[in-house]
Amino acid sequence: MDFAKGHGTHNDFVIIDDPNGQRDLTAQQVRALCDRTGGIGADGVLRVVRTEHMTAEVEQAAESHANWFMDYRNADGSIAEMCGNGTRVFAHWLHRQGYEAASRFSIATRAGDKAITVADTDDAGRAPDSQQAVVSVEMGVAEVTGLSTAQVGSENFAGLAVDVGNPHLAVVVPGWGAEEIANLHLTAPRLDDEFFPAGANLEIATPLVAGTTHMRVFERGVGETKSCGTGTVATACAALAEAGLGEGTVQVVVPGGTVEVEIRSNGATLTGPSRIVARGTFSVELPA
């Protein structure tokens, strides 16, 4: 199996080209690919499929006007509705491979179509075959669905439940700064099962200071990762709300880098880096 590897602020993905939709990845196969000791190693898998080959399987694909569908799987093999960093890497790959020649296009996801803008960059400036890019994704409306709580170890946290195409609990801890976030022992959270029957991603973040918040994330189906794109959108929304603001632009600092999130009443935009780091052939026989 040929593959590529990419990351967005060190949230990393295995990329599988399957334009005609001929490869049916099982959960066990995804787990094998994402295994960091026995496989390639990643936080998830991005299967690149022409949208027309997903219409019978995914309702959103049948309604899409985009050429390509992002079939995203978490490292545990589960299907996820949306992945913000994965969307940036997916879009970068489409543009780099020439599947989408224009710098502005849309891709189909299980959370609907997402408008994309890709700017190729390298150390010498713009280059059409660049390994890195800055990608903006129109994420749709970040919808606050209520208040909920999480227990992490012996600590209890309260935060905003935010739907960004997938569920999040974004916690802004008053009085915390970057040091407290870095020192947090972030383990698998206990969430309110009635509020989040399918689970959720948990973000722990600092209040806004000069338009910046620091964040860590525990992703549903993966564990702690160095970044989560949809999580940065949820966190920006919660940090603005904690500051008494409904809209604004926030720099979100995660262990893997920094992204910019613009929150508006009619939508949110996530902008950040993408890098393609490897291409190869996976020669180990995958489980059924």
Describe the predicted segments one by one.
Residues D123, G140-G159, H185-L186:
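Active-site glycine-rich loop that binds ribose-phosphate moieties when present
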Residues V141-E143, V164-H168, S274:
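Glycine-rich beta-alpha junction loops
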Residues M1-Q131, A170-A288:
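A glycine-rich beta-to-alpha transition motif near the start of alpha/beta enzyme domains, typified by
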Residues Q151-E180:
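Internal active-site segments that recognize and position negatively charged phosphoryl groups
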